Amino acid sequence: MSAVRVLLLPGWLDSGPGHWQTLWEQQHGWERLVQADWVWPRRGDWMARLDEALLGPPPTGADERPVLLVAHSLGCHLVAAWAAHSCHTDRVRAALLVAPPDTERDDVPPQLSGWRPMVRSRLPFRSHVIYSDGDPYGAADVARALAAGWGSSVESAGPCGHINAESGLGSWPHGLRRLAQLGRA
């Protein structure tokens, strides 16, 4: 996928050592968007950071390749909120959105209250949502409704928890195949 720039967007608290996003970063040399505050994520700050990452050169120098966003959990809501407000969405070819949580549930931690309401606007680029049946942070019907609002294709990964390190997916070959399909289309 050298014809595209892959930008990994972790969710709340970042993606740890065994997470598929971390493994992809290590195995493929892809970039991780590092946020200033992983514990108390402020939507506006995270959106500004994404704009900075897309407008500025990546760590390896100038790069005009189209971008594939790979978001997990709260990172999915970052993509939706950013796309609804940024004038730089033309830099993105597509987005893989994995395990979007329901930030409007009553039991959401107070650190995530700034992510209400969830942005449901149509995304201006291709996107694909992968959700899990039995995700403790978001019901399948909510993930499907978000995908419909975003104009995303959607699929279930089956019963995989939050599709994170605890799900035991390793480098998650299925996700890589979906990302490759998005990058080619």
Give the predicted meaning of each segment:
Residues 68-70, 95:
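Conserved alpha/beta-hydrolase fold motif
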Residues 11, 34-38, 95-105:
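Active-site nucleophile loop of the alpha/beta-hydrolase fold
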Residues 29-32, 148-164:
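Catalytic histidine neighborhood in serine/cysteine hydrolases
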Residues 2-65:
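Active-site catalytic motif of lipid deacylating hydrolases and related acyltransferases
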Residues 16, 136-142:
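Conserved alpha/beta-hydrolase "acid-adjacent" motif
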Residues 41-44, 160-171:
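Catalytic histidine-centered segment of alpha/beta-hydrolase-like enzymes
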Residues 70-80:
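Gly/Ala-rich beta-loop-alpha elbow adjacent to hydrolase catalytic centers
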Residues 123-131, 135:
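Short beta-strand/loop motif that positions the catalytic acidic residue
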